[in-house]
Amino acid sequence: MFDVDLENGVSFRESKAFKPGDRAVVAETPWCGLGMTVCYDVRFAYLYRALAKAGASVLMVPAAFTRQTGHAHWHILLQARAIETGCYVVAPAQCGDHEDGRQTYGHSLIVAPWGEILADGGEEPGVVMAELDFSRIDKARGMVPALSHDRDFAPPAPLGLRAAGE
Protein backbone atom coordinates (compact mmCIF):
# COMPACT_ATOMS: atom_id res chain seq x y z
CA MET A 1 0.00 0.00 0.00
CA PHE A 2 1.16 3.49 -0.79
CA ASP A 3 1.37 5.21 2.60
CA VAL A 4 3.63 8.27 2.70
CA ASP A 5 4.03 11.66 4.37
CA LEU A 6 5.59 14.22 2.05
CA GLU A 7 7.69 17.21 3.07
CA ASN A 8 4.99 19.64 1.94
CA GLY A 9 2.53 18.23 4.50
CA VAL A 10 0.61 16.10 2.01
CA SER A 11 -0.09 12.52 3.11
CA PHE A 12 -1.37 9.50 1.25
CA ARG A 13 -2.86 6.56 3.18
CA GLU A 14 -4.09 3.85 0.83
CA SER A 15 -4.17 1.47 3.80
CA LYS A 16 -7.15 3.41 5.21
CA ALA A 17 -9.33 2.37 2.28
CA PHE A 18 -7.68 -0.71 0.79
CA LYS A 19 -6.24 -4.02 1.91
CA PRO A 20 -3.21 -5.40 0.05
CA GLY A 21 -3.56 -8.69 -1.76
CA ASP A 22 -1.53 -11.68 -0.64
CA ARG A 23 -0.89 -13.39 -3.97
CA ALA A 24 -0.14 -12.60 -7.58
CA VAL A 25 -2.91 -13.46 -10.05
CA VAL A 26 -2.81 -14.44 -13.71
CA ALA A 27 -6.34 -14.47 -15.14
CA GLU A 28 -6.77 -16.89 -18.03
CA THR A 29 -8.73 -15.53 -21.00
CA PRO A 30 -9.44 -17.05 -24.42
CA TRP A 31 -6.64 -14.85 -25.83
CA CYS A 32 -3.89 -14.84 -23.21
CA GLY A 33 -2.96 -14.77 -19.54
CA LEU A 34 -3.52 -11.36 -17.91
CA GLY A 35 -1.21 -10.46 -15.04
CA MET A 36 -3.32 -8.45 -12.60
CA THR A 37 -1.70 -5.62 -10.63
CA VAL A 38 -2.57 -2.11 -9.55
CA CYS A 39 -0.80 1.26 -9.35
CA TYR A 40 2.00 1.16 -6.75
CA ASP A 41 2.74 -2.49 -7.67
CA VAL A 42 4.56 -1.19 -10.78
CA ARG A 43 7.54 -0.35 -8.54
CA PHE A 44 8.15 -4.03 -7.68
CA ALA A 45 9.84 -5.58 -10.71
CA TYR A 46 9.98 -9.08 -9.21
CA LEU A 47 6.14 -9.19 -9.17
CA TYR A 48 5.97 -8.68 -12.93
CA ARG A 49 8.67 -11.25 -13.60
CA ALA A 50 6.71 -13.75 -11.49
CA LEU A 51 3.51 -13.00 -13.42
CA ALA A 52 5.29 -13.47 -16.76
CA LYS A 53 6.83 -16.75 -15.58
CA ALA A 54 3.33 -17.87 -14.51
CA GLY A 55 1.98 -17.36 -18.03
CA ALA A 56 1.01 -13.70 -18.29
CA SER A 57 1.34 -12.21 -21.77
CA VAL A 58 -0.35 -8.92 -20.88
CA LEU A 59 0.27 -7.05 -17.64
CA MET A 60 -2.60 -4.88 -16.39
CA VAL A 61 -1.62 -1.80 -14.34
CA PRO A 62 -4.57 0.51 -13.61
CA ALA A 63 -3.25 3.51 -11.67
CA ALA A 64 -3.73 7.00 -10.27
CA PHE A 65 -0.22 8.46 -10.20
CA THR A 66 0.03 12.07 -9.08
CA ARG A 67 0.94 14.53 -11.81
CA GLN A 68 4.43 15.16 -10.40
CA THR A 69 5.32 11.50 -9.86
CA GLY A 70 3.69 10.42 -13.10
CA HIS A 71 5.67 12.94 -15.11
CA ALA A 72 8.94 11.64 -13.63
CA HIS A 73 8.27 7.87 -13.45
CA TRP A 74 5.13 6.57 -15.23
CA HIS A 75 6.40 5.97 -18.78
CA ILE A 76 9.81 4.72 -17.61
CA LEU A 77 8.40 2.19 -15.13
CA LEU A 78 5.87 0.78 -17.58
CA GLN A 79 8.42 0.49 -20.37
CA ALA A 80 10.83 -1.24 -17.98
CA ARG A 81 8.15 -3.77 -16.94
CA ALA A 82 7.42 -4.53 -20.62
CA ILE A 83 11.09 -4.89 -21.55
CA GLU A 84 12.13 -7.05 -18.61
CA THR A 85 9.18 -9.45 -19.01
CA GLY A 86 8.64 -9.42 -22.77
CA CYS A 87 4.94 -8.74 -22.10
CA TYR A 88 2.50 -6.15 -23.31
CA VAL A 89 1.58 -3.63 -20.61
CA VAL A 90 -1.90 -2.11 -20.54
CA ALA A 91 -2.11 0.74 -18.04
CA PRO A 92 -5.34 2.72 -17.74
CA ALA A 93 -4.63 5.85 -15.72
CA GLN A 94 -6.75 8.35 -13.84
CA CYS A 95 -6.33 11.94 -14.98
CA GLY A 96 -7.38 15.40 -13.95
CA ASP A 97 -7.85 17.72 -11.00
CA HIS A 98 -9.79 16.36 -8.03
CA GLU A 99 -11.92 18.01 -5.33
CA ASP A 100 -9.32 17.29 -2.65
CA GLY A 101 -6.69 19.22 -4.65
CA ARG A 102 -4.95 16.09 -5.91
CA GLN A 103 -3.87 16.16 -9.55
CA THR A 104 -3.47 12.86 -11.36
CA TYR A 105 -1.19 12.39 -14.34
CA GLY A 106 -3.26 10.41 -16.81
CA HIS A 107 -1.38 9.03 -19.81
CA SER A 108 -3.15 5.70 -20.11
CA LEU A 109 -0.57 3.61 -21.96
CA ILE A 110 -0.25 0.46 -23.99
CA VAL A 111 3.37 -0.67 -24.23
CA ALA A 112 4.75 -3.40 -26.53
CA PRO A 113 7.06 -6.18 -25.29
CA TRP A 114 10.10 -4.39 -26.75
CA GLY A 115 9.21 -1.21 -24.86
CA GLU A 116 7.61 0.88 -27.62
CA ILE A 117 4.62 2.94 -26.57
CA LEU A 118 1.76 1.89 -28.85
CA ALA A 119 -0.86 4.24 -27.41
CA ASP A 120 -0.78 7.18 -24.98
CA GLY A 121 -4.01 8.75 -23.79
CA GLY A 122 -2.45 12.02 -22.71
CA GLU A 123 -3.76 14.10 -19.83
CA GLU A 124 -7.45 14.26 -20.85
CA PRO A 125 -10.17 11.61 -20.38
CA GLY A 126 -10.50 9.30 -23.36
CA VAL A 127 -10.00 5.83 -24.76
CA VAL A 128 -6.74 4.26 -25.92
CA MET A 129 -6.53 1.26 -28.22
CA ALA A 130 -3.81 -0.73 -29.93
CA GLU A 131 -3.61 -4.03 -31.74
CA LEU A 132 -1.68 -6.64 -29.76
CA ASP A 133 0.32 -9.00 -31.98
CA PHE A 134 1.14 -11.87 -29.64
CA SER A 135 3.96 -13.10 -31.90
CA ARG A 136 5.91 -10.04 -30.70
CA ILE A 137 6.10 -11.59 -27.22
CA ASP A 138 8.05 -14.64 -28.41
CA LYS A 139 10.21 -12.42 -30.62
CA ALA A 140 11.11 -10.06 -27.76
CA ARG A 141 11.75 -12.92 -25.34
CA GLY A 142 13.90 -14.65 -27.96
CA MET A 143 16.04 -11.55 -28.49
CA VAL A 144 16.50 -10.96 -24.73
CA PRO A 145 15.79 -14.27 -22.94
CA ALA A 146 16.03 -12.77 -19.45
CA LEU A 147 13.05 -14.73 -18.09
CA SER A 148 14.56 -18.08 -19.05
CA HIS A 149 17.95 -17.03 -17.68
CA ASP A 150 16.52 -15.68 -14.42
CA ARG A 151 17.53 -17.44 -11.22
CA ASP A 152 17.36 -16.92 -7.50
CA PHE A 153 20.30 -15.37 -5.73
CA ALA A 154 21.46 -15.77 -2.16
CA PRO A 155 21.23 -12.55 -0.17
CA PRO A 156 24.39 -10.45 -0.39
CA ALA A 157 26.86 -10.76 2.44
CA PRO A 158 27.02 -7.61 4.58
CA LEU A 159 29.94 -5.37 3.88
CA GLY A 160 32.52 -5.25 6.62
CA LEU A 161 33.82 -2.00 7.97
CA ARG A 162 36.64 -0.65 5.88
CA ALA A 163 39.33 1.83 6.74
CA ALA A 164 39.35 5.03 4.71
CA GLY A 165 41.40 4.63 1.55
CA GLU A 166 40.97 0.85 1.26
Predicted features by range, described:
Residues 33, 42-128:
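CN hydrolase (nitrilase-like) catalytic-core segments centered on the catalytic cysteine
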Residues 137-166:
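A conserved C-terminal secondary-structure "cap"
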Residues 1-54, 67-76, 143-146:
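Active-site catalytic loop in hydrolytic enzyme cores
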Residues 6-9, 17-21, 90-92, 109-114, ...:
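Short amphipathic alpha-helical surface micro-motifs
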Residues 5, 122, 152-154:
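Intrinsically disordered, low-complexity regions of eukaryotic proteins
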Residues 130, 135:
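Glycine-rich, small/acidic residue-mixed loop/short-helix segments
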